[in-house]
Amino acid sequence: MPNTKPVVDNPDVVNYVHNKAKTVGAANVLQVGAVTKGQQGKELSNIEGMVKAGIPAISEDGKSVMNAQLYREAMELAAKYNIAVLAHCEDINLVNGGVMNADVNARELGLGGITNSVEDIIIARDIMLSRDTGARLHLCHCSTKDSVSMVKHAKMEGIHVTAEVCPHHFTLTSDDIRKIEPTVDTEKKVAIEADADTNYKMNPPLRTKEDVQALKEGLRDDVMDVIATDHAPHTFEDKNTSMKSAPFGIVGLETAACLTYTELVLGGYLTPMQMAEKMSYNPAKIIGIDKGDIEPGKVADIVIFDPDETYVIDKNTFFSKGRNTPFDGRKVTGKVRMTLVNGQVVYEDKEK
């Protein structure tokens, strides 16, 4: 994604990332370009130049372009060059300091809530812009029941829209957020207010049981096309603060496969092949690359997954520098045993 320092909003930065990735060789990196310069939402980035440098998509990652006319122009360029538009859907004007789902849990903690409409309003707008421009729209990390409904109806109308769901959004609800009871710091002689575990703070936030059920059914019915990680690592220091102050985001990469298998395959919503399709073939198809399936002559980017092992997630074993997960200590089934990139083993589980 382009939300780096510097922001990926021109071909020079795209080329730098691609060259760096080739040097490291641990994964095939496809760099997405920013929609606007500096992700400031005021002026379009050099989309044409970045397309020539090889970007498969544009995104304002982590925010929405609130200027609808500017976003329309970006979509027109995306349609012209046949690249995808990856949309984070959030009406920032409605967030109003919210840090978790707007429900009884937020009220009990005295925290600002984020309503479903924050997401749903922008989803509706972006679908309409996709309809008007012909751009290929992909909705990132959908979390609401109405997102599933809108995607379903858009597809029925022939609009070029696809959508993804993240494991935390189909596994947890706002009721699962670990609450921290109010205490008194006897050394500092101050009262510590009730709060919540910041490892449950992500954007979009965890929603309700009704939303979770709709997302699962949307994946089952192929309304929702992709299972994505929304991997957002943060340091312990970043997260070791209040729910109001902590950054949004959790690590998602190392728990995505096991949570998907446990919740959706063993839960009866997906077959193993559907899981593989939504985590590999469909994403590749959406961004227009010839990957995601195993055939003679294809590039061997392969994950070897063991569906039989049951274990407890231990954040201290993560390869990511981030340990900010709400799933530490959770019992799951299914484990990644090996990863190959271009036919070369880049990861191997040494335990077996």
Where do the model's predicted regions map?
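Metal-associated gating/positioning segment near the N- to mid-region
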Residues: 1-24
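Charged helix-capping and loop-helix junction motifs
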Residues: 12-17, 44-45, 71-73, 245
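A glycine-rich helix N-cap at a beta->alpha junction
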Residues: 20-34
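Short acidic, glycine/proline-enriched helix-loop-strand junctions
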Residues: 27, 78-83, 160-162, 240-254
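Active-site beta->alpha loop and helix N-cap motifs at the rims of alpha/beta catalytic domains
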Residues: 34-40
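Histidine/acidic residue-rich metal-binding segments in metalloenzymes
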Residues: 42-227
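His/Asp/Glu-enriched, well-ordered alpha-helical/loop segment
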Residues: 108-136, 196-200, 217-227, 232-307
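C-terminal cap of metal-dependent C-N hydrolases
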Residues: 242-245, 266, 299-352
